[in-house]
Amino acid sequence: MLHLKNITVGNPKTAEQYQLTKQYDVTWLFSEDGKNWYEEQKNFASDTIKMVYTGDGRVVWVGKDVTGIEPRNASVIEVPDITANRRITAPGYWFYRNDEFVFDYRLKAEDERDAL
């Protein structure tokens, strides 16, 4: 399962990328370990769930089609398509913390209280 952390905009790293940037105004996205987002997409399995979470861990996107993800300033993790993982929704109160997905009941209760 793949986990690309802290994906941000970066400069082209090859002559080919530079030419694509000049010609088509491509924005390059790289994970914190230097992996190219566009090249890594082919490594995601089609039968898994992909989730995008922000720097504070909030899950902001859940789905299977990796091409539908715009991960700028976020992280992408791939998880098995099992019942427990299908319960995770976005937007909502799900967070990725300490290498697991957790539901923040306190934040939900505070939001409900504030809405009264």
Q: PLM ranges: what are they?
A:
Residues 1-27, 32-35, 41-43, 68-71, ...:
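A preference for well-ordered globular domain cores
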Residues 34-64:
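Short, contiguous, helix-prone interaction/anchoring segments in small proteins
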Residues 54, 61-116:
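Negatively charged, Asp/Glu-rich surface segments that serve as flexible interaction/assembly modules
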